[in-house]
Structures are given as structure tokens and as C-alpha cells.
UniProtKB/Swiss-Prot annotation:
Binds 1 Mg(2+) ion per subunit. Coiled coil: none annotated. This is Phosphoglucosamine mutase. It comes from Xanthomonas campestris pv. campestris (strain ATCC 33913 / DSM 3586 / NCPPB 528 / LMG 568 / P 25). CDD domains: GlmM. Its cofactor is Mg(2+). Pfam families: PGM_PMM_I (PF02878), PGM_PMM_II (PF02879), PGM_PMM_III (PF02880), PGM_PMM_IV (PF00408). The keyword Phosphoprotein applies. GO terms for cellular component: cytosol.
Amino acid sequence: MSSRKYFGTDGIRGRVGQGVISADFVLRLGNALGRVLTAGRSKRPLVLIGKDTRISGYMFEAALEAGLVAAGADVQLIGPMPTPAIAFLTSTLRADAGVVISASHNPHYDNGIKFFSAEGEKLDDATEAAIEAALDAPFHTVESERLGKAIRTRDAIGRYIEFCKASVPRGFTLHGLKMVLDCAHGATYHIAPMLFRELGAEVVVIGAAPDGLNINDGVGSTHIDNLAAKVRETGAQLGIAFDGDGDRVLMADDQGNPVDGDDLLYVLARSWQASGRLTGTVVGTLMTNYGLEKALAALQIPFQRAKVGDRYVHQALVEGGGTLGGETSGHLLCLDRATTGDGIVSALQVLEALGRDGHSLREALSSLSKVPQQTVNVRLGGGAAKAIVEAASVQQALQQAQAAVQGRGRAFLRPSGTEPVVRVTVEADEAGLMQDTLDRLAGAVRDAA
């Protein structure tokens, strides 16, 4: 939807206390959602509210609850839970919507709101448009007898752990595996260690002491070096890192080498092809490494690229009948197991694949050769990023760059939609070619700016 006023590609996000990420706006947002859900129906809708561990979550949880109850919706407060857990619980508890208070991998001073439909999927454009329209209407409180009620759910953790365990065969075990878990001081801190221990693993845990301010602070999937160092220090066979809200996962092998989302896609695609589980096309994004594209082609596995954002990966999978896709950042979609990106479920799928194939993580990646890739952000002194990208001189430079790496890599430009920046990305099978092409293309963008 091109005319979004508040919603981005993944809900609403920003700095706490600024713009829309304020208590008064979130109060109105809850009321708007409640009015959309109650329209044309006599039964009170049920909305689940979950959050990650950042301190502002208390404030926004209360604001959402008040706005929803005022509009006549019932609320179940789930407390700190991974984003994908709220997607699952919304569906299994037969709720009409789920809301997550989280800014994912961002620092504690940011926060955001994500929404899920009754099916546990991200809201469609029409529903988001209806919420935005309701936001621009006055706050409404229903008559006292129609006010909603709010309760706190106590069994959510157990329900979600069983859901995750059900994503792998009943006989699946991790006995004999020593692993490091980095929970980013986020929403998986009280769930992931318990789950992997229940499956038999010896678990070393870091990033599992949230204080409201330390979420993603030097830990988690955006700081993978911390995990890698702990794997080497403890002699673990692998490490797993989640982000603050648990929808991303990255890993480290037994030598502490970082393993990103492209690597994990390869492990899963290759294993699923061999076992007959793979269906349709594997979906990556514009940022997916060219080496993965080549490796999948060698296995005769169809691959396509979507725009950056797991929303677009999901859309491409649904349209193409596929079940496996993801982003370099660690958003992985296993749609035959979960409706949305789920870090814990994705990690279990990788561990199951390794166990079935009899490989270590490092061995499973030995046949994948990624190419050097680099992105430069060119900040513009003036003019819109899209206009700079479309300038004749920049388009000519882009064509020359693409010709230089043809058959050996890719070159492309992405104008930022939120800041005066053009992102210049080049990848090639030889580092010198990549760097030279990148320098020339970035220079052309700077000259045009």
C-alpha cells in the first residue's frame, strides 16, 4: 500500500516518546484496532497482547489495553514472549487479532507495534488501511455494559514450547550436543534455554538476564561475534543467537565462524530436497548472496528474489506455492511449520536437518561458496534518493557496473524510503573486482548528488 500514513513494512516503529511511539498515540491505536474489530458484530472480539523485554513495554501494554477495552474488545495479556509465539497463540486461542510490542533488533530506546490476524499472519493492506482511517477518527468509549475485560494468561510459555517441539519429529533429540544460546536479553530468554534442554542438549546461555535496558546491547543476532567467542571458549559444537523479539536466528559453527541467514537457507534447502520435503521455489531477497543463488542452481533448486523484508518473502512464497525462504539477517520462513518467521522453530529445523544428514554445521556448509559483497550508504546533500537513482548518469554507471560483474555477481542501487541515502551494493566472485566496481558506482551516485 503506497499511501500508508503510520504503518511501515513491519508495523509501526520508532524512538520512544517521539512521533507515533508515544503513550497517547498507542492508546488511540488500541482504540482504533478495537473499533475495526467490533464493527458490524455483536460478540466482543478478543485481542492478545505480547511484548519483548524493553522497559517501555509496560507503558505501551497498558495503553493498548485501555484503548482496546474502551472500544469494547476483550484482552489477554501474554507478557514477554517472542513475536512468533504471539502469532501462534493468536491462532490457537481463537483470538481475533494479536499485537506485539517490540522493536525487534533495535536498542531499548526504540519500540514498535506489530499486528497479527486471527490466522496468525501479518495483517493485510485492507485491514491496516481500516486501522489508519480509524486512527484519524475521534477516540470512542462504548457504553459501560459493552466495555471489554482484560486478563493475564498464565500458560502461554508451555503452549508455545510444545508448539516448537511439535515442529520436529517426536523422536528428535539433541542428546550429546553442546551448544551456546544467545537470547539477546530479549523475549526468548525464559523459553529457548528450557526448550533446548528439554530436548537433551547441554546448553550454555548468554544474553538471558534482561533488565529492560540491555536488550540487543552487545548481544544477540546483531552482535554475532559475542556468540562466536563463547562457542570457541566453551568448546561447543555450535551456537545459536536470536534477536530481541525472537523472529531472527543466526548461528556459529564449532570453530566460531558466523553463519547467516543465507547459509541456513542453503542447509535447509539442500536437506529438504534430499528428504522430499522441499516444495516450490526457495525465496530470498535482493540482498541474498549471489553464491547461494549459484549453489541452489547447481542443485537444480528454483530460486527467486523478493524485496527486502520478510513480509515480501512471505508474499512470494504464498504466491509461488513455496514453503522455504528468508533473509540474510536471519528471518527464515518455514511455512509448513509456522505462519511467520520464528527463530526457535527455524533453529530446530536446521538442527533436525544436520542430524538427519549426519553433518556438523561446518560440514553442511562446505559446498557453499559465497562471494564477496559490500554495501555503501551514500548520504545525499540534497534531492530525493529515488530521483538520484533515476538520474541518467547514475543509470549509465549502474549499467556499466552490471556489465562488469555479469555472470560473476550483481550490482544494484536501493534508494532509502526513510532517509536521504542511496544504498549501493556490489558483489562479485573476486574481491578486487567487487571493490573496484563498488567504488566507481558509489562515486557516480555521489557526483549526481
